[in-house]
A protein has these predicted regions:
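Conserved Rossmann-fold NAD(P)-dependent oxidoreductase catalytic core, especially the SDR/UDP-sugar
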Residues: 91, 109-159
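NAD(P)H-binding glycine-rich loop region in Rossmannoid oxidoreductase-like domains
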Residues: 58-106
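Glycine-rich NAD(P)-binding loop of the Rossmann-fold in SDR/ketoreductase-type enzymes
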Residues: 70, 98, 102-113, 156, ...
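Mid/C-terminal beta-alpha module of Rossmann-like enzyme folds, strongest
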Residues: 226-295, 301-326, 330-385
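N-terminal Rossmann NAD(P)H-binding glycine-rich loop of SDR-like oxidoreductase domains
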Residues: 6-34
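Catalytic helix-loop patch of NAD(P)-dependent Rossmann-fold dehydrogenases
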Residues: 105, 137-181, 204-206
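Glycine/proline-rich active-site loop of Rossmann-fold NAD(P)-dependent oxidoreductases
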Residues: 167, 191-201, 226-240
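Substrate-positioning beta->alpha
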Residues: 164, 204-229
Length: 386
């Protein structure tokens, strides 16, 4: 009888933005895996890449709306009839660094569109809105302030228009007057986006900067779980930090060595640490990220098991001579990273072109940059204390 009651219940409609990106696609997959509980309505830009992706996940319980989340009428169409709105989509770095005005317009505008569209519904109180924020809103947190929680001061880094856009977007959610809203502040997601590997952001992070990472699959489980009937009333109208737990606390150089290891490459051998920023990134360990998992129960993969499987998969690929031949070696990666640092917004670009405001933000001063020891001179790599 209980099972029949579940399967005979009308499915809930979940509107998802950003469903073609990492966290979004994992969320869509998780929701579709629970059919007939949910009908997923996904907004996607009509690019050739997105259309190919949608073909791979086509499902009777998936409705795709082609459009732009900056367009209010499109958002209204997607929100109408939805029980849940999961606003995962955003312009993120490094694209956000290149197009700051579009980033502000897209990220803030889409959030305001969703809030307005929910208020246009016959009963706005029946719509539950989950907004995805970011750890970048709290800005640079070097040792000894490398711990944080929701409630800490909002202080986005200089030149970080993505973070600034998310600050104003989250504030709009907090002040929306909606009955059901929540902000899920995302951290770095593993695996990292490959596209960022060719961008100056590679040098914007101090080697010893920390993040408490999340896995993409567990992020998707988190978002799907918040759509379940068993989520308590007290979950709503709060902000939460999302991570996959203390087993994912890494300094930047540690995480990169985990990723590079199967290729026989070390961070220390390919990055010129004298050109890596001292300040002005973001990230910290969390004192409160267990709170979200205590409610939504999304941490299902032991960190050690996940990393061991990822390493084994990469090592198996590297045993294929054709694949191995396409991968960089230490020399080629080092040369490429040097080229990247000279791109606009890169750290070498800042120094060579006397971009004093950028130098001040990322190094404090030109003198401080010149005092950074090289690896050969004894630069200290360490894991900040937990």
């Amino acid at each position: 009888p209980e099972y029949r009651a579940v399967i005979s219940k009308a499915p809930k409609t979940v509107f998802v933005t950003g469903g073609t990106r990492k966290m979004g696609i994992e969320t869509v997959k998780q929701l579709l895996a629970r059919k007939p509980k949910f009908v997923v309505r996904m907004l996607a830009r009509p690019s050739a890449k997105n259309k190919e992706l949608v073909k791979k996940i086509a499902d009777p319980y998936l409705e795709v709306v082609w459009g732009d989340m900056k367009d209010y009428e499109t958002i209204l169409k997607c929100v109408t009839g939805a029980d849940y709105v999961l606003h995962i989509g955003a312009m993120v770095s490094p694209a956000a660094d290149k197009y700051p005005e579009e980033t502000l317009y897209t990220n803030i505008g889409s959030t305001l569109n969703i809030i307005k569209a929910i208020k246009e519904q016959p009963d706005p109180d029946k719509v539950k809105f989950a907004y995805v924020g970011t750890v970048a809103m709290t800005g640079d947190r070097p040792v000894p302030v490398n711990w944080g929680r929701c409630g800490d001061p909002i202080n986005p880094s200089a030149h970080d228009y993505y973070a600034m856009s998310k600050v104003f977007s989250e504030l709009s959610v907090f002040d929306s007057g909606l009955k059901y809203w929540v902000s899920i502040r995302q951290t770095g997601q593993y695996p990292p986006d490959q596209g960022a590997g060719e961008e100056p952001i590679q040098h914007h992070q101090n080697p010893n900067n920390v993040l408490e990472w999340s896995t993409a699959v567990e992020s998707g489980i988190c978002m799907a779980n918040l759509c379940e009937d068993w989520v308590p009333e007290e979950f709503w109208r709060k902000a939460y930090n999302l991570s996959s737990g203390k087993g994912w606390r890494f300094a930047h150089w540690e995480l990169m060595n985990f990723s590079f290891g199967p290729m026989g490459i070390r961070y220390q051998d390919v990055f010129d640490v004298t050109k890596c920023a001292l300040y002005n990134f973001h990230g910290h360990y969390y004192t409160d990220s267990d709170l979200l998992d205590d409610i939504l129960h999304f941490r299902v993969i032991p960190p050690e098991s996940y990393r061991a499987e990822a390493t084994a998969e990469m090592e198996a690929m590297m045993k294929n001579p054709m694949i191995a031949a396409m991968m960089p070696n230490t020399r080629s990666m080092k040369e490429n990273l040097e080229k990247i640092s000279h791109k606009e917004m890169g750290t070498s670009w800042m120094l060579e072109n006397n971009q004093e405001d950028w130098i001040h933000a990322f190094f404090g001063s030109r003198e401080k940059q010149q005092q950074i020891k090289s690896v050969e001179e004894g630069y200290e790599f360490y894991h900040p204390s937990e």
